Amino acid sequence: MASINTESDDYHPIVILIDELKNEDIQLRLNSIKKLQSIAKALGPERTRTELIPYLQDSVLEDEDEVLVVLSEELGNLIEFVGGAEHAVCLLPPLQILAGAEELVVREKAVESLCKIAKEIPTSSFEESFLPLLFSLSKADWFTSRTSACGLFTVSYPRANAEMKKSLRKTFGGLCHDDTPMVKRAAATNLGSFAKQIEKESVKSEILPLFQSLSTDEQDSVRLLGVENCALLGSMLTNEENIQFILPTIKASSLDKSWRVRYMVARLLKELCESMGTEITKTELIGAFVKLLKDTEAEVRTEASLRIADVCSLLTKEMNIKTILPCVKDLVSDSSQHVRAALAQVIMSLAPIYGKEDTLTHLLELFLHLLKDDFPDVRLNIISKLDQVSKVIGIEMLSQSLLPAIVELAEDHQWRVRLAIIDYIPLLASQLGVEFFDEKLGNLCMTWLGDPVFSIREAATNNLKKLTEVFGVDWAKNNIIPKVLSLHSHPNYLYRMTTLFSISTLSTVVGGDVISSSMVPLLAKMVSDKVPNIRFNVAKTFQTIIPLLDSTIVQSRVKPLLVKLHEDTDKDVKFYASQALQLC
């Protein structure tokens, strides 16, 4: 067995790392493998090639998968430490073994490292060492090696000579017809990227038949990978070739007996439409899309619903209204809440496509329906995209039609829905104007300050800050601050706490005059609150506002209050008061 001579090493830390390669503790071995570059640098290129790499090949390759994953990755980073690209072939033997490992993640990392090396090594080394490795993996008895081989063709083909290119295509074809589904899946996964490296005539004569074979495989796990290849191959072919070779597979896959294959068509529909082109999409793919929107499986309808806006953007408005809109109307009341939630994610994006008049005519009632859905995620998804609609139909029309529903959702039993409404309020306020806001939404913003959920109260205080930035300090001084400060005497201490949070948040935008005239007097009252939590939060609030106040006010009005808090019997109050005093 290969070993590493450490007797003559002057680098004590490196000796320790080398010893840790043999340690029984897996964490120590992992630590050493992660520092393989440091070990190799200390040993030098020659000893790394003649001692370290053989040792790793003989000893470490029997290790735990966790170690092998890291080793597979690190070996690909050793090219410069073995003497550069001309010596990188010494890294191939251990990586070939790792490429045949049982654990998928180990194999994937080994293939990544092999691809990295394949791009670096000289042509002579590539032909004499790398290609034989690829052919060896392709013909290995154990399927794991053959699956790894599938990931090496794309990087190998551009560097091979004409004769070897022919052999590579033939070998890849054999893997596409392998007896093992796992190998065929690996071949299908890599077929598209491999095809991009191949000459157009060879793609048509050799790759397309392989694609059609994989797309009609008895295993649905193989067939669904063929859908992705439809998009990749379609982008390489002409319209006529797509109609002849690719379109039949897309249509067949959209009607496949396995819902997983149909799901993949729905998932990749945007890419399929783009690769096929607008004309084929309009004449051939829309029918398939409509069937997917009406699929018996909720998972397929969900995925298809997410693609509605993408597909509609490729069609004329008339075609949208005639073919897609009826499906959308059905999906609004779909039995699956996940389908409705998916639709709610994208339906607002239809407004710019439809335009103002058709949005009001065809879509507005659907928005309202979804805003009142029983499932909170549906309501949430609609709220988060309201701005897309307001840009199209105008804020006045939005406020007339959707505002009542928005106000209703502001008191929704799901706190996440209330939170989404709060986040949307500043944008809505800037569009509605101050008078409309004060009349319709002003009281609502104050209600949130007393919400039982902390996240809502916190968001509500930040909301007030944003509204002050929109409407100005004078508005806040007259409309918001008096209401916020009035909560300081509320019997529930959480409301009193909200007053303090609001002061801290608003103080950064209202200016020193408002702080000294309105906020400091209130804090002076709250210094004597009976709840210690309130008192130490008063001290924390002072920490926020002291930098914003004139020094004379700090010395004459704030410091005496902090001195009083520093004499408090509660240790937390004393602590935060002492911190605030340091700022005085």
Curated annotation (Swiss-Prot):
GO BP terms, alphabetized: meiotic sister chromatid cohesion, centromeric; myosin filament assembly; spindle assembly
Molecular functions per Gene Ontology: myosin phosphatase activity; protein phosphatase regulator activity; structural molecule activity
Main subcellular localisation: cytoplasm
InterPro entries (UniProt xref): ARM-like, ARM-type_fold, HEAT, HEAT_type_2, PP2A/SF3B1-like_HEAT, PP2A_Regulatory_Subunit_A
GO CC entries: cytoplasm; cytosol; plasma membrane; protein phosphatase type 2A complex; Ras guanyl-nucleotide exchange factor complex
Repeat positions for HEAT: 7-45, 46-84, 86-123, 168-206, 207-239, 240-278, 279-317, 318-356, 358-395, 397-434, 441-479, 480-512, 513-551, 553-584
Cellular location(s): Cytoplasm, Cytosol; Cell membrane
Pfam families: HEAT, PPP2R1A-like_HEAT
Protein origin, superkingdom: Eukaryota
Record keywords: Cell membrane, Cytoplasm, Membrane, Repeat
Protein purpose: Scaffolding molecule which may coordinate the assembly of the catalytic subunit and a variable regulatory B subunit. Component of the Sca1 complex, a regulator of cell motility, chemotaxis and signal relay. The Sca1 complex is recruited to the plasma membrane in a chemoattractant- and F-actin-dependent manner and is enriched at the leading edge of chemotaxing cells where it regulates F-actin dynamics and signal relay by controlling the activation of rasC and the downstream target of rapamycin complex 2 (TORC2)-Akt/protein kinase B (PKB) pathway.
Family membership: Belongs to the phosphatase 2A regulatory subunit A family.
Assembly with partners or alone: Component of the Sca1 complex composed of at least gefA, gefH, scaA, phr, and the protein phosphatase 2A subunits pppA and pho2B.
Designated name of the protein: Protein phosphatase 2A scaffold subunit
Annotated organism of origin: Dictyostelium discoideum
